[in-house]
């Protein structure tokens, strides 16, 4: 859609909304920036806009404006069943998210990654591999820069490697990657998607516009994805940490291999990698399958996998203080992600958990404590819920904190040389922190100042 001289309303005044306005200004659209939060300071919103131009509307929305608006662009935090979105849909006005908006201007090849866990690490690794092959590579999403901020730099010979959330996939229409991947589907964001079936369907939309000329990489150990595979419109390639697939990357003992269906190829030994944990073997297998599908030579793939180091906030080594290793896994925002971090620990571990309640259950989280966790330090809204689950399974060594400062103090006082301290909350950061990045960086600053 050519948006020049069209009137576009953007909902949300956060990073995503401001980024959308910036792109729309550059392509010649007329913008309205709307946020229903009446408490917002108009002047601060104007300052966020900088040199960008948009009519700012805060609070109530006048439906008389509908007749002049050609397109609604919503931020990921705006549910598609919210009143403002339904008003536009009922009026027959298209509703896009930031992914669809950016895709409208992407001239290059797109590689897109989603999944409940592992997105950031896999996106970073795929981005590093592709960039070693072609310097015109843009890594976008929760990692790196925003898609809307980078898209006008793309060209016919460029690559975009995009990390995409379920919230963003709710609003795709024509988005078409040449290679997509769904890493896994486990319970998350059920306060938004309501059911696992709806959540899984939303994730699967990443391949909705693909054809058999494209590739969709799926996890052979995920039942949602093995059930989805026959319906997938793309050519399916698998990855697995447990067994050899028909076609794809897999772990065989200490070797990561690739099979094309006829021949098997050794890629690298797991001990040649800098990443901790079995879940990272899965991430590497997914990245290998994706980059081979994109036509990247094996020698470049192997070299970059060996060079790759953990991303910030994902089982990130922070420091050793008084013989105690501290790890930041603030990106572990659901129980399944946190379990993988716990499993990666090889020393007696003091675990920091809790945060905003997304409707998760914590049984798997607590079950993972056995023979791993010596003390649990709880913080945030879910403290009582997690503690109740601990009682259910007989885990009683729990302390509580009201701030990250208290958390780190408790950990430092209880840890002995040879222990590990792991921040892997199994919950979102909202309420106490702006985002998981802020939570992780505050933790790291406090640890480094011990």
UniProtKB/Swiss-Prot annotation:
Its main location: cytoplasm. One of its GO terms (molecular function) is UDP-N-acetylmuramoylalanine-D-glutamate ligase activity. The lineage of its organism: Bacteria, Bacillati, Bacillota, Clostridia, Lachnospirales. Pathway: Cell wall biogenesis; peptidoglycan biosynthesis. One of its GO terms (biological process) is peptidoglycan biosynthetic process. It comes from Lachnospira eligens (strain ATCC 27750 / DSM 3376 / VPI C15-48 / C15-B4) (Eubacterium eligens). Cell wall formation. Catalyzes the addition of glutamate to the nucleotide precursor UDP-N-acetylmuramoyl-L-alanine (UMA). It catalyses: UDP-N-acetyl-alpha-D-muramoyl-L-alanine + D-glutamate + ATP = UDP-N-acetyl-alpha-D-muramoyl-L-alanyl-D-glutamate + ADP + phosphate + H(+). The keyword Cell wall biogenesis/degradation applies. GO terms for cellular component: cytoplasm. Keywords: ATP-binding, Cell cycle, Cell division, Cell shape, Cell wall biogenesis/degradation, Cytoplasm, Ligase, Nucleotide-binding, Peptidoglycan synthesis. ATP binds at residues 115-121. Belongs to the MurCDEF family. It is found in: Cytoplasm. This is UDP-N-acetylmuramoylalanine--D-glutamate ligase. Its EC number is 6.3.2.9. SUPFAM superfamilies: MurCD N-terminal domain, MurD-like peptide ligases, catalytic domain, MurD-like peptide ligases, peptide-binding domain. It is an enzyme of class 6 (ligase).
């Amino acid at each position: 859609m050519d948006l020049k001289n069209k009137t576009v309303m953007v909902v949300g005044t956060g990073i995503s909304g401001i980024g959308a306005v910036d792109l729309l200004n550059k392509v010649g659209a007329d913008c309205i920036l709307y946020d229903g939060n009446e408490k917002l300071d108009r002047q601060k919103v104007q300052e966020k806009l900088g040199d960008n131009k948009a009519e700012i509307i805060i609070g109530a929305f006048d439906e008389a404006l509908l007749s002049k608006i050609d397109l609604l662009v919503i931020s990921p935090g705006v549910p598609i069943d919210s009143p403002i979105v339904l008003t536009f849909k009922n009026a027959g006005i298209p509703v896009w998210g930031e992914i669809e908006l950016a895709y409208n201007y992407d001239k290059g090849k797109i590689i897109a990654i989603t999944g409940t866990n592992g997105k950031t690490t896999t996106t970073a690794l795929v981005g590093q591999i592709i960039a070693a092959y072609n310097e015109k590579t843009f890594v976008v999403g929760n990692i790196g820069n925003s898609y809307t901020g980078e898209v006008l730099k793309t060209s016919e010979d460029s690559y975009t490697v995009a990390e995409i959330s379920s919230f963003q996939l709710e609003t795709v229409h024509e988005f078409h990657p040449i290679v997509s991947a769904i890493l896994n589907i486990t319970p998350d964001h059920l306060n938004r998607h309501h059911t696992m079936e709806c959540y899984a369907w939303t994730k699967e939309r990443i391949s909705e516009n693909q054809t058999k000329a494209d590739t969709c990489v799926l996890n052979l150990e995920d039942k949602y994805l093995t059930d989805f595979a026959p319906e997938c419109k793309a050519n399916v390639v698998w990855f697995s940490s447990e067994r050899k697939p028909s076609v794809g990357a897999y772990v065989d003992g200490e070797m990561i291999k690739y099979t094309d269906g006829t021949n098997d190829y050794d890629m690298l030994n797991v001990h040649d990698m800098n990443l901790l944990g079995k879940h990272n073997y899965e991430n590497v297998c997914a990245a290998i399958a994706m980059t081979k599908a994109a036509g990247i030579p094996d020698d470049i793939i192997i070299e970059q996998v060996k060079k790759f180091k953990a991303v910030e906030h994902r089982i990130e080594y922070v420091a050793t203080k008084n013989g105690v290793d501290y790890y930041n896994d603030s990106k572990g925002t659901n129980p399944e992600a946190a379990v993988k971090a716990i499993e990666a620990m090889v020393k007696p571990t003091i675990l920091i958990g809790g945060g905003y309640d997304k409707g998760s259950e914590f049984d798997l989280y607590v079950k993972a404590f056995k023979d791993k966790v010596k003390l649990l330090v709880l913080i945030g809204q879910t403290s009582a819920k997690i503690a109740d689950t601990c009682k259910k399974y007989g885990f009683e060594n729990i302390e509580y904190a009201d701030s990250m400062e208290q958390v780190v103090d408790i950990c430092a006082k209880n840890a002995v040389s040879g222990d590990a301290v792991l921040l892997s909350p199994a919950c979102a950061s909202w309420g106490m922190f702006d985002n998981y990045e802020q939570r992780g960086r505050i933790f790291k600053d406090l640890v480094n100042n011990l």
